[in-house]
């Protein structure tokens, strides 16, 4: 069960308009580093006293709420540190933009704390998934939807760039 929806954004002046709208609508938010996404998420988790993060990124407009619930339930019940949609149970495929567009990532704050201690750079503005997928101490789980991946490989369901 999701307890809080928190918008995490940056301290940059360009996000001031967003924060003003969030305040007017009484929506919880947290502002942090524009370069260190991992630290921003960790600081938000500590501020709001949560132990699990389900990351529905702003560029993932087709995220399926049923998968949000599934990710949350698995993280609460299983000894898993990181969960993500994927086209395989074995190895993470960063190029599968269909599955990544509908299934959010989720992770335990305890794993995020350990990654923040071990990371060598504070610049991870392009994402954090590789930190979780590349570290052996992280217990990973991939949700593999029952779909025809030969068709979905051609479909991109996230909005990372203007051409998307």
Q: Where do the protein language model's features map onto the residues?
A:
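Short, structured coil segments at secondary-structure junctions
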Residues: 1, 25-26, 136
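N-terminal glycine-rich phosphate-binding loop and ensuing alpha1 helix
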Residues: 1-14
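Conserved beta-strand segments of alpha/beta enzyme cores
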Residues: 4, 28, 139-141
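Short phosphate-binding loop-to-helix
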Residues: 12-76
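Conserved core of the sugar-phosphate nucleotidyltransferase
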Residues: 63-155
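An accessory alpha-helical subdomain
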Residues: 156-163
């Amino acid at each position: 069960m999701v307890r809080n929806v928190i918008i995490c954004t940056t301290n940059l002046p360009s996000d001031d308009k967003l924060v003003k709208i969030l305040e007017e609508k009484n929506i919880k938010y947290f502002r942090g580093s524009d370069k260190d996404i991992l630290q921003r998420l960790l600081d938000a988790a500590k501020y709001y006293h949560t132990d699990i993060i389900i990351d529905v990124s702003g560029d993932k407009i087709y995220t399926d709420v049923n998968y949000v619930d599934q990710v949350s339930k698995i993280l609460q019940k299983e000894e898993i540190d990181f969960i993500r949609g994927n086209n395989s149970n074995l190895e993470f495929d960063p190029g599968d933009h269909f599955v990544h567009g509908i299934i959010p990532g989720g992770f335990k704050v305890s794993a995020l704390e350990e990654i923040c201690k071990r990371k060598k750079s504070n610049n991870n503005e392009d994402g954090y998934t590789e930190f979780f997928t590349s570290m052996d101490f992280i217990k990973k789980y991939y949700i593999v939807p029952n779909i025809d991946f030969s068709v979905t490989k051609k479909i991109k369901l996230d909005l990372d760039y203007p051409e998307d």
